[in-house]
Regions:
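N-terminal and secondary-structure boundary signal
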Residues: 1-257
């Protein structure tokens, strides 16, 4: 019988700018009576890194541009907030009432460039995504391996909407030490049919599973340890979450819209 387990780390302190996230993760694991083991996949909510990496900005420090003021009238959003989104974006894809859909500087297509204020202290303080989530994941993984002597993977996750589906789901936005995909193409199913398109984004599936414990409100569980997936995922040193992003030509939804 196959199985895996997920441990949501309780008692995690509020992260401050400059905090040593890997050291805190290892310490909280031990406080929970849990030792990190080889092949563990450590899923971390992006807000942890945003705080530690000083990616929290105050609206009072932001001066909106003409473009931000114009889009503010269209969206009904604070022009200073719109300016933050523009600074983090490559392209504005859609602007309408309460909606600002962009392609951000990391290549993610998302609402408000992933900027929000959930679990951020201060009414006008907002969290930006980590500057380079893959780099953050790699630094975290290497530090944890140095502290514990164990070979692990790290996934940084955030929550996004999906085309034509209600509700949001956790996705991987930064990865290190794990192959992003479980590729079934060329293999055969139970009846001998050759699989031609099955290439599962396993890091997104792991991120979604972890979100069941991380939650979105006051759960205060920003880190989940996933154990028992060594038969399902492959170790990979050089993976990047950019591999999950498809080109406009490949994007079926863009073609429909």
């Amino acid at each position: 019988m196959q199985s895996f387990v997920a441990y949501g780390l309780e008692g995690f302190p509020l992260i401050r700018a400059g905090d040593n996230v890997p050291k805190i993760i290892v310490g909280v694991c031990r406080d929970n009576g849990l030792d990190i083991e080889d092949h563990d996949v450590i899923v971390v909510a992006q807000k942890i890194f945003s705080k530690a990496e000083r990616r929290i900005l105050r609206l009072e420090d932001i001066v909106p541009s003409k473009k931000a003021k114009k889009l503010s009238k269209v969206t009904g959003k604070d022009p200073r907030f719109v300016e933050l989104v523009l600074r983090e974006s490559k392209t504005v894809l859609k602007a309408s009432r309460e909606i600002l859909l962009v392609k951000d500087r990391r290549g993610f297509v998302c609402i408000n460039a992933g900027i929000d204020k959930s679990n951020i202290e201060g009414e006008e303080n907002f969290a930006l995504l980590p500057e380079n989530p893959d780099h953050s994941a790699r630094k975290c993984r290497l530090a944890i391996q140095k502290l514990t002597g164990k070979s692990v993977a790290v996934i940084i996750c955030d929550t996004y909407s999906r085309p034509f589906r209600r509700g949001q789901v956790n996705f991987a936005i930064g990865v290190s030490g794990i192959d992003l995909f479980r590729d079934y193409r060329g293999k055969r199913d139970l009846f001998g049919h050759v699989l031609r398109v099955k290439n599962v984004a396993v890091v997104d599936e792991i991120a979604a599973a972890a979100e069941l414990l991380i939650g979105q409100g006051a759960e205060a569980i920003p880190v989940v340890i996933i154990r028992g997936l060594e038969e399902s995922v492959e170790v990979r040193e050089d993976g990047s979450v950019s591999e999950l992003t498809i080109s406009e030509d490949e994007d079926l939804f863009r073609g429909v819209l």
